[in-house]
């Protein structure tokens, strides 16, 4: 018997072990006999009511799916626009970058044409009269900054063309004997220290003021008020002039010149000083101290343009210029302030949404495009900044005396242009105590608008205020440095231009791109420009809130820009610099 098998009767031994198969060898629990009778294996047949319920559930699910699909389809245009807008912005960035490169190429060509500028100066010395066949295009390139000076004719950019003449006039000494003030010297030294690559494209040897650097700096000053993101049919300067005229028209209905109302945009530019005076009077009549600031907590931190064309609600309404324009009906109510379904008692005939600026643009500019500033709040923000800067410009030029002693002027056109000062002209006017008796009012600004602003606008209708007055842009960028400290302690400022980091960066990028085969990415240039634009935006507000901003009360500050008289101030505002020659012997 094999001890491993309990069924010994089935064990057969024939020289091998062999176990016979038997049912008793299969050990398993007893299978339930009624297992296949359970209900789960015997489903009753579906009734008609149950089939109807299933069909109804299917129809309900299909209707819900169609409704969800309709909602998603309604959101598709918004989603598509949200995805396409960054692509459009990149395309605009590329177009603006190409335009900037074309401008840089034009500036480089002008730098190569310095000998031609010197030859033109020699031709003027020979007394060559202008050709009588000169057309209107040549007349548009002539401007007059000071009334007792002859007009200036330029090629493409007045400050850049004059810079070439300044360095060419120094002769053999080159840039070693040309200075512009400590402010420019500080910016140049900061640029060299922070961006050493700029030394490849500019000549900074022996501490000289580089002509290439000054050209790039002036172009940066001119660009800080421009909008490079987006495509617009109207400039911020045009919008500012239209708003000022509408405010004057609304608040000064008994004006003596109502019978001879302006018929063209040039008439508005000629009367710009009286519009600015009216703005100052309207703001002065308001109670409290005016606030020239936006809601910083509702604005993008490092971006000037508004995403989708609009900032957060209430971001711009705190600025006194915008509040004044809305209060007097020049601008309609801000989006969301007066809903469309408001009672007719609150908003009769939908007056709160009428936009007179759009109508004025059609009347004076007639470009076939609507102008609704609340729909493009980036342009509205730039417009308010332009109006504030114009108000500052009026205060800077108020009661200026350009007939004072000529030897007090740092800028002498006679050292650049032979015969610039006629021999019969009076070399000395009222100065010292006598100059205080002169009250010129807005005469200098009126002459500047007619003889300088209007020709430049006619030559380029897209021009912005900072392109017209780069010196004003420099003052606005330097406004924070000129703020008085609350403490009475005497502090010596050794910051070496740290406040102008944005200007230094943009100028350095302009210089570096001249020697690079792979230029700086467009996004980096836009970021640098936005940082400079945001800093410039704060300047007009700070200057507008100061009681005294003129030359008489800020001589030390203006001395850093090489400005020593009202005559210098006029040229500085228009050129962005005042050159002075030094002996290098």
Curated annotation (Swiss-Prot):
Pfam families: Herpes_UL25. Residues 125-138 have a biased composition (Low complexity). It is found in: Virion; Host nucleus. GO terms for cellular component: host cell; host cell nucleus; viral capsid. Residues 109-138 are annotated as: Disordered. Residues 1-49 are annotated as: Interaction with major capsid protein/MCP. Heterodimerizes with CVC1. Interacts with major capsid protein/MCP and triplex capsid protein 1/TRX1 at the pentamer vertices. Interacts with the large tegument protein/LTP. Capsid vertex-specific component that plays a role during viral DNA encapsidation, assuring correct genome cleavage and presumably stabilizing capsids that contain full-length viral genomes. Participates in the interaction between the capsid and the tegument through interaction with the large tegument protein/LTP. This is Capsid vertex component 2. It comes from Human herpesvirus 2 (strain HG52) (HHV-2).
């Amino acid at each position: 018997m094999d001890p491993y098998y309990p069924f010994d009767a089935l064990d057969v031994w024939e020289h091998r072990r062999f176990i016979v198969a038997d049912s008793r060898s299969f050990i398993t629990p007893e299978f339930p006999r009624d297992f296949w009778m359970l209900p789960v294996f015997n489903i009753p047949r579906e009734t008609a009511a149950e089939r109807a319920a299933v069909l109804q559930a299917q129809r309900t699910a299909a209707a819900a799916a169609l409704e969800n699909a309709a909602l998603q389809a309604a959101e598709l245009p918004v989603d598509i626009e949200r995805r396409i807008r960054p692509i459009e912005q990149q395309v605009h960035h590329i177009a603006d970058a190409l335009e900037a490169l074309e401008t840089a190429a034009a500036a480089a060509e002008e730098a190569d044409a310095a000998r031609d500028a010197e030859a033109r100066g020699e031709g003027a010395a020979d007394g060559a009269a202008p050709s009588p066949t000169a057309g209107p295009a040549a007349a548009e390139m002539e401007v007059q900054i000071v009334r007792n000076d002859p007009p200036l004719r330029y090629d493409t950019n007045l400050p850049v063309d004059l810079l070439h003449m300044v360095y060419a006039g120094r002769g053999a000494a080159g840039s070693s004997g040309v200075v512009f003030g400590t402010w420019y010297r500080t910016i140049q030294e900061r640029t060299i220290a922070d961006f050493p690559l700029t030394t490849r494209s500019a000549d900074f040897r022996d501490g000289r003021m580089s002509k290439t650097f000054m050209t790039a700096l002036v172009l940066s000053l001119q660009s800080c008020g421009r909008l490079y993101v987006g495509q617009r049919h109207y400039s911020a300067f045009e919008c500012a002039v239209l708003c000022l005229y509408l405010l004057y028209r609304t608040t000064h209905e008994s004006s003596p010149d109502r019978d001879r109302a302006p018929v063209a945009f040039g008439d508005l530019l000629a009367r710009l000083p009286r519009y600015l005076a009216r703005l100052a009077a309207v703001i002065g009549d308001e109670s409290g101290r005016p606030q020239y600031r936006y809601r910083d907590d509702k604005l993008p931190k490092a971006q000037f343009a508004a995403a989708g064309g609009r900032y957060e609600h209430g971001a711009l309404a705190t600025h006194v210029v915008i509040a004044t324009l809305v209060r007097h009906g020049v601008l309609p109510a801000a989006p969301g302030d007066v809903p469309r379904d408001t009672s007719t008692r609150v908003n009769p005939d939908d007056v709160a949404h009428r936009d007179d600026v759009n109508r004025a643009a059609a009347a004076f500019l007639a470009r076939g495009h609507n102008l609704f500033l609340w729909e493009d709040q980036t342009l509205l923000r730039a417009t308010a900044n332009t109006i504030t800067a114009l108000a500052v410009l009026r205060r800077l030029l108020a009661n200026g005396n350009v007939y004072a002693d000529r030897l007090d002027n740092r800028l002498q056109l006679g050292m650049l242009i032979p015969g610039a000062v006629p021999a019969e002209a009076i070399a000395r006017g009222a100065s010292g105590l006598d100059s205080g008796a002169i009250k010129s009012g807005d005469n200098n600004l009126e002459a500047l608008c007619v003889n300088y602003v209007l020709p430049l606008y006619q030559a380029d209708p897209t021009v912005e205020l900072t392109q017209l007055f780069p010196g004003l842009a420099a003052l606005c960028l330097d406004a924070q440095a000129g703020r008085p400290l609350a403490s009475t302690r005497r502090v010596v400022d050794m910051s070496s231009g740290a406040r102008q980091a944005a200007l230094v960066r943009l100028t350095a990028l302009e210089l570096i791109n001249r020697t690079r085969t792979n230029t700086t990415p467009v996004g980096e240039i836009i970021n640098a420009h936005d940082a400079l634009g945001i800093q410039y935006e704060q300047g007009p507000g700070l200057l507008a809130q100061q009681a005294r901003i003129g030359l008489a009360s800020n001589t030390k500050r203006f001395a850093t820009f090489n400005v020593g008289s009202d005559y210098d101030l006029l040229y500085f505002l228009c050129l962005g610099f005042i050159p002075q020659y030094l002996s290098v012997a």
